Design a protein with these regions (language model features):
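Conserved N-terminal helical subregion
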Residues: 1-6, 48-187, 241-244, 386-389
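Conserved mid-domain beta->alpha element of the FAD-binding
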Residues: 5-18, 22, 157-158, 184, ...
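Conserved Rossmann-like nucleotide-cofactor binding loop
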Residues: 11, 35, 163
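Glycine-rich FAD pyrophosphate-binding loop
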Residues: 20-41
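Conserved N-terminal glycine-rich FAD pyrophosphate-binding loop of Rossmann-like flavoproteins
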Residues: 34-54
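Conserved FAD/dinucleotide-binding core of flavoprotein oxidoreductases
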Residues: 85-90, 94-108, 142-148, 189-274
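Histidine-centered metal-chelating micro-motifs
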Residues: 163-164, 183-185, 207-210, 298-299
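C-terminal auxiliary extensions adjacent to catalytic cores
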Residues: 374-389
Length: 389
């Protein structure tokens, strides 16, 4: 079976790395990024303990390679911006091992090392054709503007992210749900003197700052703030003055951690990445089982619990595990994958929505956060971090 993979982010790279040695399958990946891309842009992310467990169980990537470019995620602090602590959760109370804190550029470097030899770069998907035998033929545009075809495939894998071109071609633009939250992200370099350490969230009403330390004296900061509507984030919110209003209490001072973050907000306001929190409808396969979707291309979700890249890792390794069972057709691959992953993904999406309560209008950041350190939420976290599929 000849498999083509569109996109070599987290899900695509891991799938290619795990699948390329499985007997009976030929895997070829394509990515629009240039060959030998060494982009140092991007911010940071946390990877949940469930992704690490999936790698221990199913292989596909060296955990030592990931740990060498990351820091452990052991604690989950929730406080108010004035310094009042609400909870301080030890992840080992709900997981078998800590998660990871890592820069996106470092994560991509590690995962793409497993897929680079099977990837053609500088290929941007433009269209999809079908040969006389019903196999799919992707049409790519190269850097010089020409259109190229790299042969026919029995199965195509959409691993090209939230705005997947392959998903759009086979199923249209997915419907998005917006909960009314604006976000920004920032990577601060040369931050050795920062008071920020492990994963922390700091609330002021329904606005929240999130931060954690990363390797190489970097700190990741993200802000979430109420923002109704859809479309791009309006310019009037993209000022230090407007953002400070969200995170400074009406009375009293802020904690040293928050003061440091606000000072970086003032300095780097023009360097931030802005977006609206959103999720899309889940789609595991299309075209009667000739297209399989992984990661954000299949089920982009709210980022509240940091499960985007984590579930992409689970997806990739689960899909490779299906191939090891030697399915006899592309449709069998897709059906087996959906049966394995459907309930798991829906659970992760539901829990992520539930955890977003403190960011929504009317949500109580204190009561809602306290509930996250108690049952039944702790039991759901254990299920999230322990029951990989």
């Amino acid at each position: 079976m000849r498999i083509g993979v569109i996109g070599t982010g987290v899900a695509g790279s891991l799938f290619v790395g795990a699948a390329k040695t499985i007997r009976g399958f030929t895997v070829q990946a394509f990515d629009r990024i240039p060959a030998n891309n060494r982009d140092e842009a991007g911010t940071g992310l946390n990877i949940g303990p469930n992704a690490l467990k999936a790698m221990r169980l199913h292989g596909g990537l060296s955990l030592d390679a990931l740990r060498s470019v990351s820091l452990p995620w052991r604690r989950w602090l929730i406080a108010l911006t004035n310094g009042t602590k609400i909870i301080d959760l030890d992840l080992l109370d709900v997981a078998e091992e800590p998660g990871l804190r890592i820069r996106w550029s470092h994560l991509y470097r590690v995962v793409r090392a497993t897929s680079a030899s099977s990837t053609l770069y500088g290929r941007s998907l433009e269209a999809l054709e079908q040969d006389s035998e019903g196999r799919l033929v992707p049409v790519f545009r190269t850097a010089d503007g020409s259109l190229v075809r790299e042969g026919a495939f029995d199965l195509l894998v959409a691993a090209d992210g939230r705005y997947s071109r392959l998903r759009e071609l086979v199923d249209g633009v997915p419907r998005s749900t917006y909960p009314g939250i604006g976000t920004w992200r920032l990577l601060v370099r040369d931050a050795a003197s920062s008071p920020i350490d492990d994963y922390g969230q700091y609330f002021c009403g329904n606005a929240r700052l999130l931060s954690f330390r990363l390797p190489d004296n970097c700190v990741y900061i993200a802000g979430s703030f109420p923002l109704a509507g859809i479309g791009s984030v309006p310019d009037y919110t993209k000022t230090a003055r407007a953002q400070r209003r969200f995170f400074q209490p009406e009375e009293g001072s802020v904690s040293p951690e928050v003061e440091w973050m606000l000072s970086k907000l003032d300095r780097h306001i023009d360097d931030m990445n802005w977006a609206r929190t959103q999720e899309i409808e889940t789609l595991h396969h299309a075209l009667d089982g000739r297209v399989l979707l992984l990661g954000d291309a299949a089920h982009a979700m709210f980022q509240t619990l940091g499960q985007g890249a984590t579930q992409a890792i689970e997806d990739a390794l689960a899909a490779a595990a299906i191939l090891r069972g030697q399915p006899q057709s592309p449709r069998a691959v897709c059906m087996g994958y959906e049966e394995r992953r459907r309930d798991r993904i829906e659970f992760a999406r539901r829990l992520t929505r539930e955890a977003t309560d403190t960011l929504l209008p009317g949500g109580d950041p204190v009561a809602g956060s306290l509930a996250k350190a108690q049952e039944p939420f702790l039991a759901k976290l254990r299920q999230l971090y322990l029951d990989v599929a």
